[in-house]
Swiss-Prot record:
Protein name per Swiss-Prot or TrEMBL: Probable transcriptional regulatory protein ETA_14870
Stretches the record annotates as Disordered: 1-20
Superkingdom as given in the UniProt entry: Bacteria
Organism: Erwinia tasmaniensis (strain DSM 17950 / CFBP 7177 / CIP 109463 / NCPPB 4357 / Et1/99)
Family: Belongs to the TACO1 family.
Amino acid sequence: MAGHSKWANTKHRKAAQDAKRGKIFTKVIRELVTAAKLGGGDAGSNPRLRAAMDKALANNMTRDTMNRAIARGVGGDDDSNMETIIYEGYGPGGTAVMVECLSDNRNRTVSEVRHAFTKTGGNLGTDGSVAYLFTKKGVISYAPGLDEDAVMDAALEAGADDVMTYDDGAIDVFTAWENMGAVKDVLDAAGLQADSAEVTMIPSTKADMDAETAPKLLRLIDMLEDCDDVQEVYHNGEISDEVAETL
């Protein structure tokens, strides 16, 4: 598959994301502890843990910090009763938004999530209101510069579902979310260094953002990501290069 690069849509947010590094670490540690607590400390048989480990390493977390978090979960040293909660809603410009949370207090979490939607002109929906528009997938991303044919051949041989190449040479490899770790291992062994690997929700349709709605969508995402209980924000908003340059 060929397509338009997502890199332009994300690069203008990198500085803000870097500023949130400390908060990201806290959230990744929480996910590591929870994944290990629920599914055990073996990443080979616990795809949720493997995905959390890949995210931790992508954010430059040390293996020592990561292993301590896993040990906390496996050893039962963490006495919090965290549960995964998914909220669905509509953002600026009719965007479909899914918010994945880890929380020990539903009332606090839903209040913060609803506030973010309301402040940016969106609204929190009911269960199932937008979930049907998304599919859970593993995505292994490669920065421009690699041999596209080499990545594609290795990915498909490793059992990937699909490979998308972009105009600027960036490449995304899509997998069943449970198989992402195994596919990445094969690609790593082939000498193909990924820029990132994550489990995400892929939208089946896109909502084009213009110069008016794009800033509102980005504000919604930032407000949600600032909530301590929010782990991930997924949406189907599409920001063109032209609009991104104005932000």
